[in-house]
Structures are given as structure tokens and as C-alpha cells.
Amino acid sequence: MVLKSLLGIASLFLALNFDAVVHAEANGAIPSIGGRYFHGRVEIPVPAFAQDDPRWSDVRLGPSTDTLGDEGCAVTSAAMVAAFYGIKTDPQQLNAFLTRTGGFTGDGLIHWSRVPSIAPAHLELAYNGGPSYELIDSNLLAGNPVIALIPLPDGGYHFVVIVGKEGRDYLIRDPAASPFRRAYHLRDLTDRIAGLCFFRAI
């Protein structure tokens, strides 16, 4: 998925106001390598989903004219995290649920606060905002994966799931990669982190 504009990114982080997201991207993005040093490789066993899986790649993303295969990185990342917490879902099922329950804007941008409503007794939105090594590292040590908003070299944006760390290198599950690919270094995809979103089990 490539998100084309900062306006689109601001809208994707709907728990924040637009100015806050613009400020975070302009002034608060952090390098993709950093934070606390992890000895060895720490990796949370997050299930892998791919947005271009033929089972759902052609499914329409929410009420938009886009498809999960083209623009479904946020929904696919959320589905990976929800499945990790034991919720029986996948990108197609989560997309259908959010479409039915007002979980998207008209352009197919996700309301992160609506994601836990698929299992309200089990999951809650804990954070949706700017990047922080402390937030990422403390969640990884607690066994919680973190969804990250990242800028891409071509000027687009993408969502991935941070699932671990090796030294100061973050490990990700990438919804645009094959589900059979091992978690790989975030630095191989981007040099910055622009935003974070994570959930917690209740």
C-alpha cells in the first residue's frame, strides 16, 4: 500500500487532530533504528496476513473505490494484531465488520477507535499518536505488538506491525510482503517512524 498524501495520513490517525499529525510528521518523526538496546532477538508471534492475498485482494476497502490489495495496509495490520490477541478475524472479515459499523471514512480511511468493537470485551485502543521509542520498547517487552505509520522513499506512506527488536533494529510484519516471509528489519523499508497505534487486551 502507498498512501499518497499527508492529508490522507492525518485522516488515518483520526484520534488526533490534523495539526497534531502534521506536526508529528514534520518535527516528531524518529529514526527507524534506536531506543533501548535489546540483547539477542525478541519477537512476538504475531500471525502474518498479506493485503494482496487472493482471498481478499480484490475486495473493496470500506465504502471507498480502492481494494484491500491496493490500499489495505491499515486494515491488514489491524487484523494481524487482533488475531494475535485471540480474535478470530482476518483482513476481509475485519474490513466487512468496520464497513458495517461505521469504521471508515467515506474515502476508506480507518477509524482506529472502532477496531476494538469487533471484540469489546477483549480489546481496547491504548494509544494513537506520535512516535516514541519508549512506547515501542515498553510494549514489545510487555508482549504487545505496535502498529507503525512509516514514510516510504517514494513519498508515500504505509502501515506495518512492529513485532520485535534485535539490538536497536525493529522487526516488522509487513502487510505488503508475503505472509511466508520472516519478520524483517524496519530499516530495510524506511529510515523513519511517523506515528504509532497499539491496542491492549482487557
Model segments located where?
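Active-site-adjacent structural segments surrounding the nucleophilic cysteine of cysteine proteases
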Residues: 2-103
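Conserved active-site-adjacent core of cysteine acyl-enzyme catalytic domains
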Residues: 15, 19-25, 45, 79-202
